[in-house]
Amino acid sequence: MGPGPSRAAGVLRPLLGMLALMVAASNRAASAFNLDTRFLVVKEAGNPGSLFGYSVALHRQTERQQRYLLLAGAPRDLAVPDGYTNRTGAVYLCPLTAHKNDCERMDIKEKSNPNHIIEDMWLGVTVASQGPAGRVLVCAHRYTQVLWSGSEDQRRMVGKCYVRGNDLELDARDDWQTYHNEMCNSNTDYLETGMCQLGTSGGFTQNTVYFGAPGAYNWKGNSYMIQRKDWDLSEYSYKDPEDQGNLYIGYTMQVGSAILHPTNITIVTGAPRHQHVGAVFLLSQEAGGDLRRRQVLEGTQVGAYFGSAIALADLNNDGWQDLLVGAPYYFERKEEVGGAIYIFMNQAGTSFPDHPSLLLHGPSRSAFGFSVASIGDVNQDGFQDIAVGAPFEGLGKVYIYHGSSRGLLRQPQQVIHGEQLGLPGLATFGYSLSGQMDVDENFYPDLLVGSLSDRIVLLRARPVINILHKTLVAKPSILDPAFCTATSCVQVELCFAYNQSAGNPNYRRNITLAYTLEADRDRRPPRLHFARSQSAVFHGFFSMPEMRCQTLELLLMDNVRDKLRPITISMNYSLPLRLPDRPQLGLGSLDAYPVLNQAQALENHTEVQFQKECGQDNRCDSNLQMRAAFVSELGQRLSRLQYRRDLRKLLLSINVTNTPSRKRAGEDAHEALLTLEVPPTLLLSSVRPPGACQANETIVCELGNPFKRNQRMELLIAFEVIGVTLHTRELQAQLQLSTSSHQDDLRPMTLPLLVDYTLQASLSMVNHRLQSFFGGTVMGESGMKTVEDVGSPLKYEFQVGPMGEGLAALGTLVLGLEWPYEVSNGKWLLYPTEITVHGNGSWHCQPPGDLINPLNLTLSVPGDGPPSPQRRRRQLDPGGGQGPPPVTLAAAKKAKSEIQLSCGSDHTHCVWLECPIPDAPVITNVTIQARVWNSTFIEDYRDFDRVRVASWATLFLRTGVPTINMENKTVRFSVDIDSDLVEELPAEIELWLVLVAVSAGLLLLGLIILLLWKCGFFKRARTRALYEAKRQKAEMKSQPSETERLTEDY
């Protein structure tokens, strides 16, 4: 026996295995609509594990008694005890009561014998009702006939279907019930119809009964139909050959008219394994009992089981049935999608599109689309609705989708969660569905939902209320605050009426609406409030049908600024109902629990205008215009800002007008504002006129409320300039005029201001004028070894003040010097020996051209040995000393003869020296050490008492950025070189040496006196000798001194 397909053997077992591995999927939000989940009718199986609810149907019994029944198939139910059979399945009929266990077993008399096997025949795999006053179809697709060949038997699982009367009893007088319905030949094998499994699907129309047989022809499958017209009976089957088996044609089946023909019927049958992607065949009747293929709609994903569930419904009310196809195993891993419903909209009876008009998805692992059913117009809006089961999403869910003039709405209008029903043991809720019948006779069709957990649930539809004449009127419609009283400014009148969407004229229930009125909802603070309170919100109740209208008073708030835009008074309403917190069992009337039609707007609004001087149309057409410019403190327009660190203020001049033009009336501009957005470098300092502007994240200036016709206004805004850097190229302000009056040409104005950054570095010298000397002997270059051999030292110290911000890669600060290098005949003048830079660190500067110490003479080290013989006389301070400058002989003589050598003269040849100055926040010292070339001065300037050598140094900026500049700083420097030095002042003698010398002198003087006395020096001489001595002394006094003799030579 081949593995014949069935919802039991081929689908149920793997699904039951999957159920243990499923996880609860995320809940999909959907507002509850009119299928009630609080007052339930629940039925349970008497025998657990019978799969009670595997198939369900709603049925109306009109014979013998008037009642509505819930039909449930239990294909694994125990058999009626006969001593031979254990399990056959069953069909139960359940009355509409509050009891769970009052279902009755339908009497299907079938006994087991050697020629056929009813054990495990799955009676109840298909249950269908023909509709009001119609018959009932029950199938057992695993019914097996036995062929005997001697002692051996061959079993043929051909399936069997039973038709019973409206009262679910067998009426032998009814040909529908007595006909054998044996469409499959058990004398053939599985390659023909010997394993057809008839009844896997089936149903009724008014004059036909149809069956699906997916096991026929090697499980290619087939569809059968029996049609009765008066006393004629015709059998139809699909006999077109297919290329392969295992298509499962007939797995599901629907028959109806207005599909591909206005009146003729079309058979729609699913083949979920066609080409591995599944398909739906559309078949039509042909003469001779054949069903001809008209169209095949194929699935899009392998293994999705496209075609395992189908439904027909006129979704857009165009008179043609549209097609819905389930693919419960469709998935998109990245999108967390599990299951799909394909919607094919009928193209006016010609065909269906090859691709779905709409594709609905369910959550991952939900088997969304395992069941799908047309449930009628559940909300009575004129369009058919559908239900989709997702039995493995949590405990199971049922999605309700509504039809519309555009077709099926994409979003579900209601999602019914199995968890919310509060039924212990419930699982796989939504496994089977049946609708299109109003079992509680409230004019709304209800829905029966089955499961694999031996439970079925009836969900009844609640009445839907349409709110009519929801009028909201405000008086006066144009408000003049001058006419407001202490108790009222505005009167609001609201009126309601309703009807039932099903049009039941007897439905006259007392309904109370809860409504909320809100004044100026979109503005804070609001401009109106209700007289009963200080609030702009009012909550009230409205009883229908007794109450017709209500009137409320509103007052105007104080200090209302906005008198241009209307005040909107909005109203929304709802229908509060007291429902039980938990679901209850019972069949009480749902008329007391209506719901509002969600397709209607649940709110309304009206507007109140202010009285304005804006013409007869009450619309203010303003003509705000603006001119703006950055200006200097003298009022001059600026196109470029010359920025310096000491710059503090920048002014912005703005002129605003509201004058009529040819295009605009120039009427009052209400709530006229000027908004400025400026960069963080501009900080608001002051405004003229004072108080016109306020600064927060932006600068907002109030121009007037209103800014009247022909009014003009000038604003002068002062900014403090902070944070401008070398990278700042432009300052940009954006200005925007706004008004609540009508003016649609207001555009932002962008006001750019280019920035030229002026650096403010400084240059100074420690000593602008140095003094030195020359003298001694002439020495050639070849004889010089150290810089001391060149001449007396010079030391120039320049100080560069910090410029504030570092240039980095934007440029370089450079100290340049015109250096007196040679005299006109090419002899050395001032010989540079070393340039050092001290800032953030210390380093040597080497200008290009090998101009510093080009002879590579050995530099002097401070403190090394005595000076050379040429420097034995006292040397002059080379500059930078703390004491007074030494006085030369020439200086003492007031420099009788002097010559000046300077760069730019014919006597001097100068070279250009450059040293880059690094970025530093501190003063940078540049020290230039040099030597007077002694030999040049001795040879060429020995006739001069003083030679003055003068030049200059310039600090300048070298950059390629045109917006960065700096004023060059120039200092002049010189050195006076004298031809000789004054004699050195005597050195100070220590006190103890003076005392010793005085004592020694006194001792020597005493010894001399003693010797003179011994020699008789002190004895009185004769008179003659005395005179001779005096004469001699006088002669001595007349002789000139040595100094006098020296001066007489000059």
Curated annotation (Swiss-Prot):
Cytoplasmic-side positions: 1012-1050
Annotated InterPro entries: FG-GAP, Int_alpha_beta-p, Integrin_alpha, Integrin_alpha_C_CS, Integrin_alpha_Ig-like_1, Integrin_alpha_Ig-like_2, Integrin_alpha_Ig-like_3, Integrin_alpha_N
PROSITE patterns tied to this protein: FG_GAP, INTEGRIN_ALPHA
Binding positions for Ca(2+) 3 per the UniProt entry: D438, D440, N442, Y444, D446
Organism superkingdom: Eukaryota
SUPFAM superfamilies named in the record: Integrin alpha N-terminal domain, Integrin domains
Location in the cell: Cell membrane; Cell projection, Invadopodium membrane; Cell projection, Filopodium membrane
Topology, Extracellular side: 33-990
Start-end of each FG-GAP repeat: 38-103, 108-170, 184-234, 235-291, 292-353, 355-410, 414-476
Glycosylation sites: N86, N264, N499, N510, N572, N604, N655, N696, N840, N856, N925, N934, N968
Region named Interaction with HPS5: 1014-1020
Binding site for Ca(2+) 2: D377, N379, D381, D385
PTM statement from Swiss-Prot or TrEMBL: Phosphorylated on serine residues.
Keyword Iron-sulfur: no
Annotated transmembrane regions: 991-1011
One GO BP: positive regulation of protein localization to plasma membrane
Keyword vocabulary terms for this entry: Calcium, Cell adhesion, Cell junction, Cell membrane, Cell projection, Cleavage on pair of basic residues, Disulfide bond, Glycoprotein, Integrin, Lipoprotein, Membrane, Metal-binding, Palmitate, Phosphoprotein, Receptor, Repeat, Signal, Transmembrane, Transmembrane helix
Covalent lipidation (S-palmitoyl cysteine), chain numbering: C1015
Signal sequence region: 1-32
Binding site for Ca(2+) 1: D314, N316, D318, D322
GO cellular component, one term: anchoring junction
Record function comment: Integrin alpha-3/beta-1 is a receptor for fibronectin, laminin, collagen, epiligrin, thrombospondin and CSPG4. Integrin alpha-3/beta-1 provides a docking site for FAP (seprase) at invadopodia plasma membranes in a collagen-dependent manner and hence may participate in the adhesion, formation of invadopodia and matrix degradation processes, promoting cell invasion. Alpha-3/beta-1 may mediate with LGALS3 the stimulation by CSPG4 of endothelial cells migration.
Subunit and partners: Heterodimer of an alpha and a beta subunit. The alpha subunit is composed of a heavy and a light chain linked by a disulfide bond. Alpha-3 associates with beta-1. Interacts with HPS5. Interacts with FAP (seprase); the interaction occurs at the cell surface of invadopodia membrane in a collagen-dependent manner.
Protein name as it appears in the record: Integrin alpha-3
